A protein has these predicted regions:
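C-terminal globular interaction/adhesion domains in large, modular proteins
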Residues: 1-259
Length: 259
């Protein structure tokens, strides 16, 4: 069972402690120098959580440029403490051998993901929130506690399998947003499209981000307007699976005869 866990499969493990110190090791627990890979910490207000979230930010393009992208595909990132998370940025092009990111924390994906030279990819996290291509240009890190209209989204595409946790049921009769909201949003997506090609697996309720699903509008405690959802299964997975994907064997009882 240990060998099946992505932490043990990952060729690169990045860790941020509670005060933001970054360290990394390889699969054999040898130290890895990622000081030149643009891995940092920053904070912004998540209006769904009604809390400031501190993220360990992984610049995927810089990770490849510095030569420390995991050779076998899986990357494990952990961030210790309360209201801690991981954010993936500059990730439109991933390592060519495929790329899987796993974390016990929630993950934010900022901007297009795996849209250039698409490869088999997966993201596994306690919860996954999409920040559009406009999050950075709009400086939305500083506008998280403002009305939804101050965080306008732009069209954004993600190509990856997701394993994630939906939130627990919110107020009586309100549900948790169901499948269409298992992927979370924080912006005004009205009239904009979120394109998603992948496969969604929800195996648990999220444990760390506990803010309830609330939709939709520009006032009160509303925090987003939904996008046009252009979602589809990615047939790439029929022939190529993301690195580290667990593989099972099905044994079926059948007839037996001795000749």
């Amino acid at each position: 069972m240990q060998a099946a866990k992505l932490y043990y499969e990952a060729d690169l493990r990045i860790s941020a402690d509670a005060v933001g110190n970054i360290s990394a090791t390889d699969k054999s627990d040898n130290p890895v120098d990622v000081s030149g890979c643009n891995i940092s910490t920053s904070s912004f207000y998540d209006k769904r959580e009604e809390a400031s979230m501190t993220v360990a930010e992984v610049d995927v393009a810089a990770l490849q440029a510095c030569g420390e992208a995991p050779a076998n595909g899986p990357l494990y990132v952990q961030h210790d403490g309360l209201q801690k998370a991981v954010r993936l940025v500059n990730s439109s092009e991933l390592p060519r051998q495929g790329f899987t990111v796993a974390s016990e924390n929630p993950i934010y994906i900022q901007g297009d993901y795996n849209t250039v030279n698409k490869t088999a990819a997966a993201v596994l996290a306690d919860a996954i929130t999409i920040l559009s291509n406009n999050w950075g240009p709009n400086d939305s890190d500083t506008k998280g506690d403002q009305v939804t209209s101050n965080r306008p989204a732009t069209n954004t595409t993600v190509n990856a399998a997701f394993a994630l946790g939906p939130s627990a049921e919110s107020d009586v009769g309100q549900g948790n947003g169901q499948l269409e909201n298992v992927i979370r949003f924080l912006e005004n997506w009205k009239g904009k499209t979120f394109t998603y090609n992948g496969s969604i697996i929800a195996l648990w309720h999220s444990q760390q981000p506990i803010g309830s699903w609330r939709c939709c509008g520009n006032s009160g405690d509303n925090y987003y307007r939904p996008p046009n959802r252009n979602w589809a299964y990615d047939p790439l997975f029929n022939t190529t699976i993301p690195p580290g994907t667990p593989v099972g064997i099905l044994v079926m009882r059948g007839r037996w005869a001795q000749g």
